Regions:
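Secondary-structure end/capping motifs
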Residues: 102-177
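Short, surface-exposed acidic
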Residues: 25-29, 138-149, 181-188
Length: 195
């Protein structure tokens, strides 16, 4: 089951948010860059440009260019568009394992998930300590940038039915934009590992 090109999925999410906000595709011209640094360069050169960057690149770009500011949080926009009690979330990262590996190493997978959840809890409880580890691991060049970015990263851990509902809603949006982006249909229940 292919999930399509990662950059196309980002475009589908953006187009969904634009459309759901009442704008037509014709009202917005999208230009994609392959690196966050390219977007930051365009923003530095053109004061009328609008850029879309993920964290921590937003925080790093603002630190280098004080004329930049955050005007939209896509997670908040996504959440505001979810009606009828939908638990859909703007999912940007998941842990995936194939069924053979899961069957052979269920305890290992469960341990990984438990430690992953603990890591996220640690990051929320001690952003300064987490930022130092993030810098040490080379994920972000400076701990100060990581620490400033962490609250806006929306790092969460979901499992069980909450995870399934959040991801299924997200995949439904991708399906509506381009069915092939999710392999032609929504995944069956056995796609999800409900611990």
């Amino acid at each position: 089951r292919g999930l399509g090109d990662v950059y196309k999925r980002q475009e589908y999410v953006l187009r969904y948010l634009i459309s759901a906000s009442g704008l037509s595709d014709d009202a917005v011209t999208l230009e994609f860059k392959s690196e966050a640094s390219e977007v930051a360069a365009v923003l530095a050169e053109d004061p009328n440009a609008i850029g879309l960057l993920p964290q921590p690149f937003v925080t790093a770009a603002i630190a280098q260019n004080d004329s930049l500011s955050v005007v939209l949080d896509l997670t908040k926009v996504w959440d505001s568009l979810q009606e009828d009690g939908s638990n859909s979330r703007l999912v940007t990262g998941v842990s995936i394992v194939n069924n053979e590996f899961l069957a052979a190493h269920k305890d290992l997978v469960d341990t990984f998930l438990t430690e992953h959840e603990a890591s996220i809890a640690y990051t929320a409880a001690d952003p300064e300590g987490a930022a130092a580890l993030i810098e040490k691991a080379g994920i972000v060049a400076k701990a100060a940038i990581a620490q400033k970015a962490l609250p806006a990263c929306n790092i969460t851990y979901l499992d069980g039915q909450d995870m399934k509902d959040a991801l299924n809603g997200y995949l439904s949006v991708l399906l509506s934009q381009n069915p092939q982006s999710v392999g032609g249909s929504l995944p069956e229940d056995d796609f999800y590992y409900l611990q």
